[in-house]
Amino acid sequence: MLMPKRVKRRKQFRGSMAGKAMRGNTISHGEYGIVAMESAWIKSNQIEAARIAMTRYIKRGGKVWIKIFPDKPVTTKPAETRMGSGKGSLEYWVAVVKPGRVMFEIAGVAEETAREALRLATHKLPVKCKIVSRADLEGGAGSEN
């Protein structure tokens, strides 16, 4: 699972997911990618499941880039616990994703293979996604999943 090696503070506020992604909204490494269409917290195990789905489909060929990193800690209190007595313990790590964010990229395989691998990965993620190519993002609209 992905998680930071060390953090300045163990527990964080929830924060806001308003607005669009200003950074990470272009395909920088690969030829095809998955773009988020809505805001969400994506857990580290969901990122890992999507990565495994892609790499198993493309087998030995190609390269996959993960463009998001779970750097936000999420805490929970035990079930049937009274309110108060401090913030809960750290449960898992999430990556905050906003609309327009490129989450995964893939290169080195045929277009049909890349699109199918990315389609399998989108089923592992809790957001609506769009599969795009480098030409789609430079030119205009992408293909809908």
Curated annotation (Swiss-Prot):
Pfam families, alphabetized: Ribosomal_L16
Origin superkingdom: Bacteria
Keywords for this protein: Ribonucleoprotein, Ribosomal protein, RNA-binding, rRNA-binding, tRNA-binding
CDD domains, per the entry: Ribosomal_L16_L10e (cd01433)
A biological-process GO annotation: translation
Family of this protein: Belongs to the universal ribosomal protein uL16 family.
Function: Binds 23S rRNA and is also seen to make contacts with the A and possibly P site tRNAs.
Annotated protein name in UniProt: Large ribosomal subunit protein uL16
Organism: Lachnoclostridium phytofermentans (strain ATCC 700394 / DSM 18823 / ISDg)
Lineage: Bacteria, Bacillati, Bacillota, Clostridia, Lachnospirales
